[in-house]
């Protein structure tokens, strides 16, 4: 019970992912994961007041709000529940548009109805972090028709990437 959900930037998220043989999801995968969750909590955005949402006290406030919502719904730590945070995601836009090469892609924070609060957004610089950002990791080994593939290779494959991404 002694923990706090801490946001981080994309470089720290990727370093952790690499150390665990994982990758960040695409927006498409975030939607599929949301559809498969065991439950959902309501989105609870804090009103931005200057840089307040980037301060550690708001990280703690957000964590406390999530804990209270889990308790209210009877959810347990470790269950796959959606609605907690926006995701830092992989995006074709960051890889191909030079205007965004030093930015972070965020997406998600789904309402219980399934509607997304944050469409894919790539305009924050890569050092920007606020309480609403979360990191979800996906193991690099995936099965396609019973054959194991590396997810990074699938995302690079013109024939297969559509299984994991809906970006052009």
Regions found by a protein language model. Name each.
Residues 67-130:
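Extracellular C-type lectin-like domains
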Residues 33, 90, 106, 135-137:
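Generic structural hydrophobic/aromatic packing signal, biased to beta-strands
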Residues 5-14, 129:
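Short, glycine/acidic-rich beta->alpha junctions
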Residues 53, 63-64, 103, 140, ...:
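Detector for Asparagine
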Residues 10-76:
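Conserved hydrophobic ligand-interaction patch in extracellular adhesion modules
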């Amino acid at each position: 019970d002694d923990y706090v959900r801490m946001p981080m930037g994309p470089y720290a998220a990727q370093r952790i992912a690499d150390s665990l043989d994982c990758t960040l999801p695409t927006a498409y995968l975030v939607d599929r994961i949301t559809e498969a969750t065991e439950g959902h909590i309501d989105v609870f955005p804090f009103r931005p007041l200057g840089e307040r949402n980037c301060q550690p006290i708001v990280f703690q406030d957000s964590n406390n709000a999530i804990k209270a919502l889990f308790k209210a719904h009877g959810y347990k730590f470790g269950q796959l529940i959606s609605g907690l945070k926006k995701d830092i995601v992989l995006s074709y836009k960051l890889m191909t548009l030079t205007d965004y090469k030093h930015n972070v892609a965020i997406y998600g924070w789904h309402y219980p109805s399934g509607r997304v609060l944050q469409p894919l957004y790539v305009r924050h610089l890569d050092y920007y972090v606020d309480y609403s950002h979360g990191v979800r990791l996906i193991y690099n080994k995936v099965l396609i028709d019973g054959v194991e593939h590396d997810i990074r290779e699938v995302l690079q494959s013109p024939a297969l990437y559509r299984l994991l991404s809906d970006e052009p």
